[in-house]
A protein has these predicted regions:
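N-terminal Rossmann-like FAD-binding beta1-loop-alpha1 element of flavoenzymes
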Residues: 5-32
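Helical element adjacent to the flavin cofactor pocket in flavoenzyme catalytic cores
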Residues: 143-205, 209, 375
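Dinucleotide-binding Rossmann-like beta1-alpha1 core, especially the glycine-rich loop
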Residues: 51-129, 270-273
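C-terminal catalytic lobe of FAD-dependent flavoproteins
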Residues: 307-389
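Conserved Rossmann-like nucleotide-cofactor binding loop
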Residues: 15, 38, 213
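Flavin-dependent oxidoreductases
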Residues: 18, 180-185, 189-295, 301-308
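Glycine-rich FAD pyrophosphate-binding loop
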Residues: 25-46
Length: 389
């Protein structure tokens, strides 16, 4: 007989951990199941991203309303959270550059969108001001987005985990969900523990926040689940700023004008290959150091485990960084790769109840800006699906 439990959450990435923390305010018993051996040392995809706290100017409210809303809310919530707990986070801002007239026209679109999304402080800057901020960046025009920042993702996930654990959340690491079912109107979960033993548990409510596995799990209870995913790998490189004069860089996020591209899995929005300062250990503390990330370069892959061996040559990054002309392929060394699941033909996040069991909530396609949006997503889940204790 399956053991009855309170709330079950599948997935110990940043979204799952934030949901656990948010629900711990009202729910008495919460179990989070994570198939990896741990959560706090960068074991999950959440730690393999650029570490940018996005401001929210890339997402229109017509086709991507959840991303538009949660990115702006999440940016503010992360800023408050990191300040409160003295986490490695700096509001370094972002400069979005245009290198030709067509891109310059798109800056107006993003400036208008920043107003619609209520992103504070966004403005055009002159070439003179751009030169004062980042002398080695070349562009005909630019936007300054001051609320964007950078954080060290693993440290943030660790803090959310510790807070949730202190609130009584039970984190079952090394425990994989291998089947889902519905019995008598209630969710039923088949789990395999780290020692190989298998068991069934019956939660009162289930939150599927399994990241790249979310759609596969949804199909276990709904063969006709309407969404499909493509696995997208993002590769990045790095260089050392100041290695020579052309590589001097003051640490502002530098982004190209976003593009919408046609791919085998549909239209995809991409923020492009950008420059982002990285955290290093400086005098025994995690601080912004001299390492600069260049990326990501996106490639569709077949396996969620295909992120170890570099797939992109340095020269391919240089093709996308004309706004930083002093950078050469020989300056670049491999950094890291990560996998995200993007929904085919659905540019927004998906957050909703299972069609056959309203006690199951699925979160799918939580790609960029998923990390930034995580605290806002968690609040939304609590307010919309857990109104009663």
């Amino acid at each position: 007989m399956a053991e009855k439990i309170g709330v079950a959450i599948i997935g110990g990435g940043v979204v799952g951990c934030w949901i656990a923390l948010e629900l711990s305010r009202t729910q008495k018993e919460i179990f989070l199941f994570e198939k990896n051996a741990g959560i706090t040392r960068g074991e999950n995809q959440s730690s393999r991203n650029s570490g940018v706290n996005h401001a929210g100017i890339n997402y229109d409210t017509l086709t991507r309303p959840l991303k538009a809303r949660f990115c702006v809310e999440g940016n503010r919530l992360w800023h408050e959270f990191c300040t409160r707990y003295a986490l490695p986070y700096f509001r370094v801002g972002k400069i979005m550059v245009a290198t030709n007239k067509k891109e310059d026209e798109k800056l107006d679109l993003h400036l208008k969108r920043s107003i619609e999304n209520r992103v504070p402080g966004v403005r055009r800057i002159s070439r003179k001001e751009l030169h004062e901020l980042e002398p080695n960046v070349r562009a005909i025009s630019a936007l300054l987005i001051p609320t964007s920042g950078v954080f060290e993702p693993t440290s943030l996930v660790r803090q959310v985990y510790f807070l949730a654990s202190n609130q009584g959340v039970q984190f079952m690491v090394g425990t994989e969900v291998i089947d889902l079912a519905v019995e008598g109107g209630n969710p039923l979960i088949k789990i395999r523990y780290r020692d190989g033993n298998v068991d069934w548990v019956k939660p009162e409510k289930l939150v599927n926040a399994a990241g790249v596995d979310a759609v596969n799990l949804a199909r276990m209870v709904d063969n006709n689940f309407p969404l499909k995913t493509a696995l997208i790998r993002g590769d990045s490189m790095k260089f050392r700023r100041g290695a020579r004069q052309e590589l001097e860089y003051n640490g502002t996020n530098i982004y190209p004008t976003p593009k919408t591209i046609q791919t085998p899995f549909g239209l995809q929005h991409t923020v492009g290959v950008h420059l982002t300062p990285m955290f290093d250990y400086v005098d025994g503390k995690i601080q912004i150091g001299d390492t600069v990330m260049v990326g990501p370069k996106l490639t569709q892959v077949k396996s969620q485990h295909d992120y170890i061996t570099p797939m992109v040559e340095p020269g391919e990054f240089i093709q996308h960084t004309s706004f930083f002309p002093g950078l050469k392929a020989s300056d670049l060394t491999p950094n890291f790769g990560g996998i995200q699941a993007r929904l085919n033909g659905h540019p927004d996040f998906f957050i909703g109840r299972d069609r056959g069991c309203d006690k199951i909530i699925h979160l799918a396609g939580i790609d960029s800006p998923g990390f930034t949006s995580a605290p806002a997503i968690a609040r939304y889940v609590r307010e919309n699906f857990f109104q009663t204790v």
